[in-house]
Amino acid sequence: MKKKRSLCAALLAGLIVTAVCLTGCGQKAAGNGSSGVDSDKVYQVGVCQLTQHDALDAATQGFVDALNTILGSEHVNIDVQVASGDSTTCTPIVNSFVNKKVDLIMANATPALQAAYNATTSIPILGTSVTEYGVALGLSDFSGTVGGNISGTSDLAPLTEQADMILDLVPQVKTVGLLYCSAEPNSEYQVKVVEDYLSNKGITCTRYSFSDSNDVAAVTTKAAADSDVIYIPTDNTAASRTETIGSIVRSAKTPVVAGEQGICAGCGIATLSISYYDLGYKTGEMAAQILKGEADISQMPIEYANASKLYNADMCQELGITVPEGYTALEG
């Protein structure tokens, strides 16, 4: 599959990159840790994570744990860099990995994937916490396998089922506010699917978009005042501002149905969400196969995780929401 490469990949001077040191805590059961790896081999892996919030942190931890478990921690050096929520910072991060000639790059979130996509055609790249790869990479003929040097995992949960949760939890709903960051293409994609589905059921949907975190409070206040229910997709900007959003929707008594459990825990009543730790772990398993020469990344389809119906017990009680059967309370 041919790729449209960006002509502009200039490094931005003076950018501060946050390095995160992750340990192997929370690992799944380990095997012998180094099956199929030469005794003196140490793989170099670079991780570019867009920002720090529960979902992305869990995905990176799962990825690290999988590689340490499968390859053995003595056989892999993982350099985790966080772009502090600035998508432009992803470019110098991945360029540094390319210059170091790492064996594999893991891109956690869409802007990180886009930066890696534009940086190299030879180093294997695995994405995670990416909703729709065709949208993220501008691939009009995407059908499940990106090809070339890119594959990964998707955090996409069934969007029509998420939309149905709004009807299950707030059956009297007439207006839904779609709250998201307009700078995140995967958020735009999710909003369109949910908007079309609910509109066909006679629900009035209105988009409330913010361009960055500075606009979140004002836009959320407007959405909460105008809407019976707010829907927030898997959106990194929203995920980093759940405390702000939660304060506003509590005051307005406006329930939020979220695209992932981190947002739900911070400001929502319910979500149909995957485990980001498991998603990252699956990505790490794919990475181990590639590094050991057991799989050709160009032939590896995008993989998905199973989704579960979860609810925020405290928020539901506060807003008087009756939760139907089939939902599990969020832990913590």
Language model: regions and residue ranges:
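Short, low-complexity disordered leader/linker segments with a strong preference
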Residues: 1-44, 69, 73
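Pocket-lining segment of extracytoplasmic ligand-binding domains
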Residues: 185-254, 260
